[in-house]
Regions:
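Glycine/small-residue-rich hydrophobic helix-like segments
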Residues: 192-221
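An anion-binding catalytic pocket shared by soluble metabolic enzymes
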Residues: 22-114, 121-132, 138-139
Length: 236
């Protein structure tokens, strides 16, 4: 039984309308991740940088399931891991390391970060080949997908620079032997990209289970007549 104060409500008087709207969107994204079955108990994280000059971002409270996340119980922290608001919750340190690595750069393109440990995502992350361009979803990541070598649980701050270096200017990354990660300018942007990456991995695992992976058509480069790849949300 979960004895954490799920119904905790943050003091709205200290929160701007812009931040509150961001909280609502991020909490909704947590519910969608739960709806699609992408959760791994209480692990994995979706975070969003709070608008303003301070390096603050929102993260899920440690110990709550995704279907328990609300706009009020999201935790606001800085890139050093300090909790900003008065809250009874703690945060997951490994999640802090991964997400603060991206938020500390303060890129307008990477305001939102989403990271999952799905079965299919981890299966693809554990292969030497990585993601193969065999579907309309995975082809949208052709030459647009980063990879990060596995260093064990992300508990040490010095990994942050290597995470940033691995991501580069890409908007999606496979953490080898670990899981999936997407970034975006907005919550919907990052979520749509995550959906495409998750579907890509599901299709690849299904093709492998059917014994047809070796006969799949591998996409190589866009045709001058086909601009589909540039229009896919995951590649924008």
């Amino acid at each position: 039984m979960n004895h954490l104060p799920v119904d905790f409500k943050v003091d709205r008087s200290n929160i701007s309308d812009t931040e509150w709207d961001l909280r609502v969107q991020l909490a909704a994204a947590y519910r969608l991740v739960d709806y699609f079955g992408w959760t791994e108990l209480i692990y994995g994280h979706l975070t969003a940088r709070v608008p303003g000059p301070e390096p603050h971002f929102l993260i899920n409270p440690y110990g709550l399931n995704y279907d328990e996340i609300t706009a009020s119980n999201l935790v606001k922290i800085d890139v050093d891991g300090a909790v900003i608001d008065d809250t009874p919750f703690e945060i997951n340190h490994a999640g802090f390391v991964i997400h603060s690595a991206i938020h500390m750069k303060h890129s307008e393109e990477n305001q939102v970060v989403m990271h999952t440990h799905t079965r299919e995502g981890m299966a693809v992350a554990g292969t030497k080949e990585g993601l193969l361009p065999i579907s309309m979803f995975s082809t949208s990541f052709y030459k647009r997908l980063a990879y990060h070598e596995y260093e064990g649980p992300s508990l040490f701050l010095d990994e942050r620079e290597r995470l940033l270096e691995s991501l580069g200017d890409k908007k999606a990354m496979i953490l080898k032997n670990h899981g999936l990660l997407t970034v975006g300018r907005t919550v919907p942007d990052a979520f749509i990209r995550l959906h495409a990456l998750e579907r890509s991995c599901q299709i690849q695992v299904d093709a492998g289970a059917a014994g047809t992976l070796n006969t799949c058509l591998l996409y190589t480069s866009p045709s001058p007549r086909d601009k589909t790849v540039s229009r896919m949300p995951s590649s924008a």
